[in-house]
Regions:
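GTPase G-domain guanine-specificity segment
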Residues: 171-187
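ATP-dependent carboxylate-amine ligase catalytic core
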Residues: 20-35, 39, 45-131, 139-166, ...
C-alpha cells in the first residue's frame, strides 16, 4: 500500500495532470489480464476516498462486475466507457458529466492496454487517447526482473499520442527483486 499512497500524493498535485476534463485522472492499464489491475484500482480508489477526495471511477468496456467493486471502494457508481458500443462523442460527454464534480477520476482498463475488438478498437488505449488520460501500467513482475525494461519502453513508445506516466509492480518477491525492477524503470 505504500506505493498506492505515493501515487495518491502524485495525484494531489493539481498542475501535473490537468486536462480539459479535470485536474487529476489516471487510467490503470496492463500488458495483459491477470496482472492485478482490479486489485490495484480498488486499493487506489479506497486510498483516495480515505483522503476525503471525491473519486469518480470508470471501467473500460462493458464489464459490470468490476464496476460493482468500484462502487464499494469509491462510494459512488462506476461508469462504463465502451469504445465498441459507444460513439466517441458519447464517451466524451459521459466523462465530462461524471468528472465535473470529482477531485480525481480513476479508469480501470480492460485486458491488455492495446487489446480490443478489432486491433485497438474498444481498447483501454483507445479510451486513454480519446480522453487524454495518463496511464499507469500494472506489471506482473513474477519471475522477471530487468526484462521489464524493454516491456516498459515498448509501452511508452508504441503510440506516441499516449502518455504512460508510471508503472506499479505486482507480485514482487523481495527488496532485491524490487531494486532490479526499479533500476529497469530508471534505465
Amino acid at each position: 500500500l505504500c506505493y498506492i499512497y505515493e501515487l495518491v500524493s502524485y495525484l494531489c498535485f493539481p498542475d501535473i495532470l490537468e486536462t480539459e476534463y479535470m485536474r487529476s485522472h489516471l487510467l490503470i492499464g496492463a500488458a495483459s489480464s491477470g496482472s492485478g489491475k482490479t486489485t490495484f484500482t480498488l486499493g487506489l480508489l479506497r486510498a483516495l476516498r480515505n483522503r476525503s477526495l471525491r473519486v469518480q471511477p470508470f471501467k473500460c468496456g462493458p464489464d459490470y462486475i468490476d464496476t460493482r467493486h468500484h462502487k464499494m471502494a469509491a462510494g459512488c457508481a462506476s461508469v462504463n466507457l465502451d469504445g465498441f458500443m459507444m460513439s466517441e462523442g458519447h464517451i466524451k460527454d459521459l466523462y465530462a458529466r461524471y468528472t465535473s464534480n470529482a477531485d480525481v477520476a480513476v479508469t480501470e482498463g480492460v485486458m491488455g492496454l492495446f487489446d480490443g475488438y478489432d486491433a485497438m478498437r474498444g481498447s483501454s488505449a483507445e479510451i486513454s487517447g480519446l480522453l487524454r488520460i495518463p496511464i499507469v501500467l500494472v506489471v506482473n513482475a513474477k519471475s522477471t526482473a530487468y526484462s521489464v525494461a524493454p516491456l516498459l519502453y515498448g509501452f511508452r513508445n508504441f503510440r506516441k499520442d499516449l502518455n504512460v506516466v508510471g508503472a506499479v509492480f505486482n507480485f514482487v518477491a523481495s527488496e532485491s527483486h524490487y531494486s532490479f525492477l526499479r533500476q529497469a524503470c530508471e534505465d
